[in-house]
UniProtKB/Swiss-Prot annotation:
Keywords: Cell cycle, Cell division
Domain of life from the UniProt record: Bacteria
Family, similarity comment: Belongs to the MinE family.
Function: Prevents the cell division inhibition by proteins MinC and MinD at internal division sites while permitting inhibition at polar sites. This ensures cell division at the proper site by restricting the formation of a division septum at the midpoint of the long axis of the cell.
Organism (species): Pectobacterium atrosepticum (strain SCRI 1043 / ATCC BAA-672) (Erwinia carotovora subsp. atroseptica)
Pfam families: MinE (PF03776)
Name listed for the protein in its UniProt record: Cell division topological specificity factor
GO biological process, one term: cell division
InterPro entries: MinE, MinE_sf
Statement: the UniProt record of this protein carries the keyword Membrane: no
SUPFAM superfamilies assigned to the protein according to its UniProt record, in alphabetical order: Cell division protein MinE topological specificity domain
């Protein structure tokens, strides 16, 4: 039966291929559009406050916003601090 299925199977039309690609693009954009407009400014403000106390590379701070359900958002902040320098006694 596999041989019969091979000859009778229809190839995907270009319309179906285009539809699948469009669905992938739309899904990727939706995932990226969930980020609020204030998040980059919030990251800059947090980095500015941290830099008042510790010399830090801006790449060592990550801010992510996760959507947990319809009405719950979780803001995750990860800061990699440099090694503490020993002070002479």
């Amino acid at each position: 039966m596999a041989l019969l299925d091979f000859f009778l199977s229809r190839k995907k039309t270009t319309a179906n291929i285009a539809k699948e690609r469009l669905q992938i693009i739309v899904a990727e954009r939706r995932r990226g559009d969930n980020e609020p407009h204030y998040l980059p400014q919030l990251k800059r403000d947090i980095l500015e406050v941290i830099c008042r106390y510790v010399q830090i590379d801006p790449e060592m701070v990550t801010v992510q916003l996760e959507q947990k359900g319809d009405d719950i958002s979780v803001l995750e902040l990860n800061v990699t601090l440099p090694e503490a320098e020993e002070t002479p006694k």
